[in-house]
């Protein structure tokens, strides 16, 4: 009996040792599974700046994708950090309205296509450090999703802001369109429409039941576990709840933790350590466009001041041209202007044309005037 127990113990120890040394399933899909995988981190938002539409948009990830193809990593880690202006950890916490995002679904769809399809031959995971609002739809476009222990995976309650209309039938059509498009991102990650609707529409409830090991999402309160029974708020998840319900595959507070969860025991992080992955590209971009936006606000203030003086029409024109140039160089600058004050590139071009006509006619004064804040 003792010999049998000893033999079983030895077999168990050998099995565990083999499992510990076995390569990750992701590593087995590499061109050379025997090689330690080279990792490449792509931030979606960084160091507290993660506005959808500006910090996170297609234009910068086109540059990142090109770099990925040159560096040829074996694993891409998408790192989501987008708070949608919610600086507090409670749902009704302090909001920074200037940092609220407004998703351009076409831009976001092209961005996800670029990252998932054009780079689809490389293993990918989504690692959420924080996700509030529309960034959650983007994060859930990836089936392999992990979170940090204090991460939020909050819903998209602001959808309701964009469907307001006095005609209920128009609201119904707008709402169906918005939620349908947003749920398209979730479908790409393999998540059910019931989840997406509950994360966008406050009146929708959400519960889950289990069919064996399979989780069944329900758009009612009759499931085994009630996720969201409040008809006044959308469904929000913290990391622990998301893990318990299978929304995220595990909790990792560092890249090292994440790699262990993925089954890797060794990896090549030289790109990360040498600042050669997407972190530098995205970080430089965020810094540059935000500087350009700050300078454009100064230039627009100069335009408003000079345009009222017939003798300074040329100075007004030069100031406004700087705003135009910033918008052309960084679509994020135009996005921010449109979000905050309704000023688009088309409007700036129109104002420049008006200044040109006034200069020709010799008239002046009463220039473009101010734009109302939002």
Predicted regions and their residues:
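Charged, glycine-interspersed solvent-exposed loop segments at helix/strand-loop junctions
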Residues: 159-281
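Bacterial N-terminal signal peptides that target proteins for export
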Residues: 1-8
């Amino acid at each position: 009996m003792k010999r049998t127990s000893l033999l079983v113990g030895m077999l168990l120890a050998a099995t565990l040792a083999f499992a510990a040394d076995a390569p990750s399933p992701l590593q087995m899909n590499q061109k050379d599974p025997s090689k330690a995988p080279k990792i490449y981190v792509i931030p979606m938002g960084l160091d507290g700046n993660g506005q959808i539409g500006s910090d996170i948009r297609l234009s910068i990830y086109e540059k990142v994708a090109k770099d990925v193809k040159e560096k040829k990593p074996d694993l891409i880690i998408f790192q989501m950090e987008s708070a949608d202006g919610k600086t507090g950890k409670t749902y009704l916490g302090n909001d920074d309205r200037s940092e609220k995002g407004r998703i351009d679904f076409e831009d976001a769809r092209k961005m996800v296509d670029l990252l998932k399809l054009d780079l689809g031959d490389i293993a990918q995971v989504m690692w959420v450090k924080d996700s509030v609002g529309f960034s959650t739809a983007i994060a859930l476009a990836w089936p392999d999703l992990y979170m940090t222990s204090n991460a939020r995976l909050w819903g998209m309650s602001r959808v309701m802001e964009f469907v307001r209309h006095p005609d209920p039938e128009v609201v119904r059509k707008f709402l169906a369109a918005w939620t349908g498009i947003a749920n398209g991102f979730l479908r790409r990650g393999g998540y059910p429409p019931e989840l997406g609707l509950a994360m966008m529409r406050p009146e929708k409830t959400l519960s889950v039941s289990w069919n064996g090991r399979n989780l069944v999402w329900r758009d009612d309160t009759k499931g085994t576990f009630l996720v969201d029974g409040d008809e006044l708020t959308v469904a929000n998840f913290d990391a622990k709840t998301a893990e318990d319900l299978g929304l995220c595959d595990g909790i990792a507070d560092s890249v090292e933790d994440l790699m262990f969860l993925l089954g890797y025991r060794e990896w090549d992080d030289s790109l990360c350590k040498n600042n050669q992955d997407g972190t530098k590209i995205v970080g430089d971009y965020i810094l540059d466009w935000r500087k350009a936006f700050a300078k454009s606000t100064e230039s627009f203030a100069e335009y408003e001041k000079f345009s009222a003086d017939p003798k300074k029409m040329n100075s007004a024109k030069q100031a406004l041209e700087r705003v135009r140039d910033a918008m052309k160089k960084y679509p994020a600058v135009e996005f921010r202007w449109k979000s905050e004050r309704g000023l688009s590139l088309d409007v700036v071009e129109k104002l420049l044309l008006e200044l040109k006509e006034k200069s020709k006619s010799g008239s002046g004064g009463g220039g473009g005037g101010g734009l109302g804040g939002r």
